[in-house]
Structures are given as structure tokens and as C-alpha cells.
């Protein structure tokens, strides 16, 4: 996943909102859960379910000599969504670039699978349709393939055994039953500034929210929200780094409401550039995908890049060139290849970038090695429509974006996406497709569980609030475990990132840039927005480089 939850992260509530090659089912049907509940390796009567553990993304550290040299403006290391989008943006003005990927497929954590009438995601599941995200889709020829969720579809949080709707607009605040009246009053007074003053040091998400909005908002909304976005621990996540826009409201306006009014005033007084008329106009707060899943975006960019995208190219070393720029050595299917480039963008995970950069800057490598990526499992299962509890049905159907589960509510699953309700053509008629996330910073023990154990946990959890207790066992569509899933923006994250960049500068690594979800943010939309930002940095450098 590049976030997201959950990242780049895959998440059902956010509106900001490391994978192995695809492995498909060997037969044209899915296996009932009852057939695998006591098995570690799944193979019953010829049926085989698609269950896999994502392999670590590794880059060889040994230097390799030889191979022809080629002069390039930029080499982008890593063909996840960040690297691909940087290349897409830059290629208009700097077509003399290359994107290299150690694995045999592009797209990073985006993993869309289609089989037997089901279409599901095993990494990020959707994106916020922001203008940068929509611009990228339109520029890649995907405007007609965009699909948007119903903005009126409810979102739920599990609390005291019931799935309770989250308010989607201000008029809902007085009536929703997720919080008590005292809790609502505490949040309201805190939002206008009647709360303890900031402590003068960087706060965790939990500290910031409890101080500004009270314990109920934290426990019943923000804690599960953090699980959905980061699969993280809000007592350790940095408010400034993880939710910077909200943090800035208090910083600039003295309170959350004060900052909101100030931001509105500044926007109204600032001339606004005309919106690109090519872009669709999403209604309300919704999320988006594509007709054939998120995979369509990296596939479209890959097709546009053509021979500029190199797969199964394993970076062995980077050295500074005497004539300026950098010398890169790769192990490729064709043998050892050497490249000469004026600039490099590292969009691989921070722990991979750390290993590659260590010969160039020990301090930068040490800083990048500090970021933590907890494991997350994506368990996709399907039930017949009649398995859904009657109270969860609207007009005979399950409707909504999905549900999140606070850690205090006695379930292990982080949350569930209603995949077949969110977007069209995700499951056959009469079937409900559910994408469930499990693991995260508070539950790394999932790495010791088998796929059947993960499915058993998810099925048991769902029968507590969504599925009828005596419903038939689910069919298992896919199980994917990401050992290092989502970078955690912990307290000190921004300082650590600044330390890495400063060390690179101190070591004279001009023209070497960092990108990816640990830099931009974990949501898919933030990766795309971050790609525009990094592309602007690189093109600015190349413009200056041309005059040296």
C-alpha cells in the first residue's frame, strides 16, 4: 500500500482518505472459509484460494561495475504511484528521463484483482477526488473511467455493540448518537478556544484532540480514524505531521474554529485561478476509483512512459560523478547497466532509500532508517446478501462506505470497506463483497497468523455487528499481508525528515530528492499531490542546472 489505509493508506472516512507481484486464483471459484479454517496451506479438492504474503522490497547493496553509460535529466527510482506520477508530470518538459523498478510490475502497493465477477483491492481502496488527483486521471486519459461513491452514503463507527453513523454535515451534529450531550458540549467549547493552552512542544494526535475536543471525540471518532488512515497508534502519531491542516488551524487562529474562519477569510480575499474545465465536479464528500479499479492509473501512466519505464532493474549503487550529476549502476535482466543522470528522485520506502544512500551520507541514511512501517493484512471475503443483519439493510441492500472499529470495542479488525456498495460492478448480483483490514501498529502479531486464522478473526468480528451469527461461512476472495505497510508519522517525523534532507545538502548531494508516502502523506491522493510538488522541485533544479 503507498498509505494509506488504510493507506496511501486504505481508509473509509478520510477525504484526503509494498507489494509482491499479483498471484491469481488457479480455478474459477473461491473457496468456502469452512474448507480452510483448519489449514495452513490452502488446497482443498483442487480449489485454491488467492492468499499471499507480500515480499519485502529489497535493493542489492553491492556495487557492480561495467555497462554502457547514458546521460539523462532525471532517474526516478521506484515505480509506485509517487514515482509514476512524478514522471508523468515531468515528461512534458523533460522527456529525457527514466523510471526504474526492482520488481517486475509497476504500481507499488496498488493491487487490483479481478476474477469470476469480483473486482477487489488489496492495497489502497479509493482516493479523495481532489483537483490534483482528478487532473492526473484526466491527463492520463481516464476521465471516462472515473467512478465516485455516493456522497450521501453513511459511514459507521462501532460503539457499545452497535454500528453508529458518523455525522456528514453540521446539521447532523445535534442528533447523532455516537457521543453524549456532555461530550458534544465539551467538543464545541474546545473548538472555539475554551480549553487548555498548547503545551509548547509537539503533541501526539491523542494529546491534541483530548486537549481541544475532549475524550469522547478522541475515543469514538479520532482513534478509529487513525486506525483507518495509518493503522497507527494515536498516542504516538504526530498531530502536526499526520493531520497538519487541522493542527495549523489552532496554530494560526488560536483555536480550531478561529483558524477555520481565518482560513475562509484568506481564501475569499485571495484571487483564485480558474478551475480546469476538463475536470469533473464531485458532489459532496465522497471517494473515487476507476471502472476497473485503482490499477487503471499506474497502468495508464506505464503505457504513456513506454520504454522510459524499466522493470526488474535492481539498483546496486549511486555515486557522484566527477563531471556533475550522478552515476547509477543496475542489475537488469540484460546484465549490468550504468546510467548518468543530472538528478535522481528516490521514491522507494525510507528503509530502502537508507541502504542506498548510506555510502553517500551516513547521517541521512541513519535518519531515514528511523521510520516505522507496521504490518497490515487485507482480507477480502464475500457473503450472500441474506447474511447481512436486517437492521443493517436499507431497501433490502447494504449501503454505506464502511465501518471503523475503536480498539476498545473488543474486535481485532481495524475496519471494513463495503466494496460492493461503494462502487459498481465489484461483485455478482446477490453477493456482498467486504474488504477488511487487520493489524497495524497495535497488532503486529498478525505476522504470526496463517491466512485461515486471519479470515477466522475477521469473520468472528463481523458476526458481532454486521453479519447474522448463524449465517453461512464466507467465501474467501483474497488474503494479502503487507509486512511493512504504512509509514508512521510519529512525533518527531518532520524533524527526522528535515535532518535527512539537511544531511544530504551538507554532503553536497545537490539534485538528489526524496519522495513517496513517508514524505508526502500516506493517502493515495496525497501521494499524487506530493508528486506534483516533487516534480516542481526537480524541474526547478534542472532549470538552474542548465545555466551552470
Swiss-Prot record:
* Conditions for induction: Oscillating expression during diurnal growth. Maximal expression in the dark period.
Q: Transit peptide span?
A: 1-50
Keywords (alphabetical) are: Chlorophyll biosynthesis, Chloroplast, FAD, Flavoprotein, Heme biosynthesis, Oxidoreductase, Plastid, Porphyrin biosynthesis, Transit peptide
For the region Disordered, give the residue spans. 265-287
Q: Name one GO biological process term.
A: protoporphyrinogen IX biosynthetic process
Catalytic reactions on record = protoporphyrinogen IX + 3 O2 = protoporphyrin IX + 3 H2O2
Output the superkingdom of the source species: Eukaryota
User: Which pathway does the protein contribute to?
Assistant: Porphyrin-containing compound metabolism; protoporphyrin-IX biosynthesis; protoporphyrin-IX from protoporphyrinogen-IX: step 1/1; Porphyrin-containing compound metabolism; chlorophyll biosynthesis
As to how many cofactors bind and how, the note says: Binds 1 FAD per subunit.
Q: Where does FAD bind?
A: 78-83, 101-102, 123-126, 522-524
Q: In which compartments does the protein localize?
A: Plastid, Chloroplast
Reported function: Catalyzes the 6-electron oxidation of protoporphyrinogen-IX to form protoporphyrin-IX.
Q: Which protein is depicted?
A: Protoporphyrinogen oxidase, chloroplastic
Q: What is the lineage of its organism?
A: Eukaryota, Viridiplantae, Streptophyta, Embryophyta, Tracheophyta
Gene that this polypeptide is encoded by: PPXI
